[in-house]
Amino acid sequence: MGVFTFEDEINSPVAPATLYKALVTDADNVIPKALDSFKSVENVEGNGGPGTIKKITFLEDGETKFVLHKIESIDEANLGYSYSVVGGAALPDTAEKITFDSKLVAGPNGGSAGKLTVKYETKGDAEPNQDELKTGKAKADALFKAIEAYLLAHPDYN
């Protein structure tokens, strides 16, 4: 098994606590509202805390797909969150799991700065496919921007 690590940063005009709530604690409600392609988020194992596995169902290219998302840790006090993709359409055949560790901090003008570390664990000696990585990043960025747009369009959310 190989482990490949990538880091990314993103800025948002939305305050850290509001963004964290939408991305983590209220994500099951916000994501389907922010993106029509997301149909449902359901717990298939656990109570919402670490160890919980969620099934996220969405439409892509006219097809219903899902992803299994395992919560690794939640650090509300420090606006940190870690989860792994452990199955479904977002997990390439070459990957054992893909873990996302994120943390939000105060950014410029009352907004947020997000720091993300991605750990891509491959099966055997496989290496991540660069095209799949680019596609995955583009989808993650689009999800983030859709949630950000939802929050900006709903200033009373909190």
Swiss-Prot record:
Keywords, in A-Z order: Allergen, Pathogenesis-related protein, Plant defense
GO cellular component: cytoplasm; nucleus
Biological-process GO terms, alphabetical: abscisic acid-activated signaling pathway; defense response
InterPro entries: Bet_v_I/MLP, Bet_v_I_allergen, Plant_def-hormone_signal, START-like_dom_sf
Expression by tissue: Expressed in hypocotyls and leaves.
MF GO annotations: abscisic acid binding; protein phosphatase inhibitor activity; signaling receptor activity
Induction (record text): Induced by salicylate, methyl viologen, chitosan, hydrogen peroxide and sodium phosphate.
Top-rank lineage group of the source organism: Eukaryota
Gene3D superfamilies associated with the record: 3.30.530.20
Matching SMART domains: Bet_v_1
PROSITE patterns on file: PATHOGENESIS_BETVI
Function as written in the Swiss-Prot or TrEMBL entry: Involved in disease resistance.
Family: Belongs to the BetVI family.
Name the UniProt record assigns to this protein: Stress-induced protein SAM22
Origin species: Glycine max (Soybean)
Lineage, top ranks: Eukaryota, Viridiplantae, Streptophyta, Embryophyta, Tracheophyta
